[in-house]
Amino acid sequence: MFRRLLIATVVGILAVFAVAGFRHAMLLLEWLFLNNDSGSLVNAATNLSSWRRLLTPALGGLAAGLLLMGWQKFTQQRPHAPTDYMEALQTDGQFDYAASLVKSLASLLVVTSGSAIGREGAMILLAALAASCFAQRFTPRQEWKLWIACGAAAGMAAAYRAPLAGSLFIAEVLFGTMMLASLGPVIISAIVAWLVSNLINHSDALLYNVQLSVTVQARDYALIISTGVLAGLCGPLLLTLMNACHRGFVSLKLAPPWQLALGGLIVGLLSLFTPAVWGNGYSTVQSFLTAPPLLMIIAGIFLCKLCAVLASSGSGAPGGVFTPTLFIGLAIGMLYGRSLGLWFPDGEEITLLLGLTGMATLLAATTHAPIMSTLMICEMTGEYQLLPGLLIACVIASVISRTLHRDSIYRQHTAQHS
């Protein structure tokens, strides 16, 4: 047992350096090609001329597609083992390391060029790769899946500053692929990754800054639960739209570089209306939480961002869909809150409350992981007073969504991009 805890600690540290390496590479490319040192792709897009804002995501997609196609032609074969940590956990616990690194590099290209895809997916993959590489050298074969799970949880903890949610992500999303008794090392890896990440960044700040002054009462619980019902209906719709967009891109029968370039071009066109469509949505989420916009502004940005996410994901851009889903949930919750706020004197607080609820419940509806989704929002914002209400709403959203759509967003995304 002591040996496992020691290895879990090492895996957590390796995951932090994997995540930090990707993050610093991303910041370097943004500085080199976009002249942006703010860390915000939305700021970068705002400061670019219209033609560069239009073409940059397309060129990034083209470069990523050429890289992926070139690697496949160079090796003259498809990956001989999984290039995704979920696939690795569901098979024999092995990766095609070279193909996985190329996939991560392609993700780096599309992320830094503005595609509306999550950077955290590549971070978690690299963390799992580091854990797998260590495990194959120093642990018996039957433990390889456990250490990949630890690496993924640690990567998620470092990327989102949410160690408990990172642990439960493994337990809920991949339920059945590992025994509950193995959760101890997973939690250790996640917490170690969170602590080391805080030390490296010289900060233990929350991922999102929120000023929610409301005290949750009976009326608020009713609104939170109703938001869960709404998210439970919206989740399957989002998954259906993502699947339809993917099929649409595939039906065009374009070579990977042109398919990814087309997805990037759509993002570029949308960014001419609002630069908020660039990136994974983190900056826009923070701005909405700081000062919730008016109804029509939320609706306009939401529609543009949704189309950008569908174009990026549908075209096969390598990256995560977790953070973009958080923004979509926030926007749905805030639109609902703004509509209800017309009849309540504290409309601003209701909008913010239901925005946070929307983040948690749409995440639950798309991942089918209600406990992880609840803890994720609480850990990222520090609003633990919402935990009871969010937990109920997330369970409701997950049940409704699972009834209407069998596959979670991760299983659907893995099936599309494998």
From Swiss-Prot:
GO terms for biological process: response to acidic pH. The keyword Ribosomal protein does not apply. Residues 26-53, 167-172, 243-257, 312-315, 373-379 are periplasmic. Its main location: membrane. The chain crosses the membrane at residues 5-25, 54-74, 146-166, 173-193, 222-242, 258-278, 291-311, 316-336, 352-372, 380-400. It is found in: Cell inner membrane. This is Voltage-gated ClC-type chloride channel ClcB.
